[in-house]
Amino acid sequence: MDIIQNYETPETSKELSLVYLAKPIYGGWVTFTVHLIKKFNYRLYKVGKRTEKKLRPYGYDIDYQNLCLEDLLKLPNLFITAVDKHYWSILPHLPSTTQIVIHDPTELKTSKTNPNPLVQDYQLLTQFKVYTIRETVQKYLLDNFQIPSTFKVHPFYQYECNKESYECQAVTISRIDFDKNTDLILRANQLIKDPKKRVHIFGAENRIYVHHKLGELDFYNYWKGKFDKSYPLTHENKDILQNTKYVVDMSIIKNDGGGTQYTFLEAIYQGCVLILHREWIKQGTLFKEGINCLAADSPEELAKLLSDERDITSLIHESQKLLKPHIQVKW
């Protein structure tokens, strides 16, 4: 799984009409949509009560248009970049030619009291062409729901990096949430004696997680806030990743892992070394500890990695090889 260096990209010539059917304004769903638009110049739509002529800002210098469902159905080649429960009711109205992306198993959670129509009852996913962006997700969807999908790697847009650097040794740029294990990073910070080697935290926060898990871990001393919705990722108009040595991402997603996330690709693109959770790495063969990334699964181990000096030249060189399929892929 995840051996994508030899990934062959199928040809495509149809212009897609991208539709974002979800509430989140931060995270991987948003970033995936942004890279598709910037890379292939597709148009973006959302569904509203009425059609608006004016465009609204989506972030990252991208605009979208609100359409009523009737007008949405007039568009060619509908492509759902993400869908959450707030928009499930729209899916039965879409044509069978619609394409849809499933990003991770959390979108496929089942419930006896509130069935998930994507995979329960109506099994709406069977009506569409389904794409998955990690092979673990592709396998999970097939093994558990007998729904086939096509695996395609994340598309990556090569943005310009022309801003002054933020200048620190290590950052984390994922959402601050339960599945991101930000508490593990903060516990490592407590063990690192040199303040310059501690991890600076950026990203949108789940306030429930912060309240229950991070309250006693000095979170607000290390959290620098949300970064601007632009590329390169900036804080106070300084490039967060430029000249940064390490990007720490302790993500674990049940029934997922092994492949890439946008935080990984952004780090690799800007020459940072990834420090990943070992459980994520074990789910595939793409990332190789000590070859194209580093790994930890405890605060003590992470603190040691960040405290020790090492030559990272080879790690950066090997990780750069992982980016090519994402630059070449066609969607």
Where on the chain are the PLM-derived regions?
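Nucleotide-sugar-dependent
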Residues: 180, 248-265, 277-285
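Short beta-strand->alpha-helix junction loop in the catalytic core
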Residues: 105-106, 136-137, 150-162, 176, ...
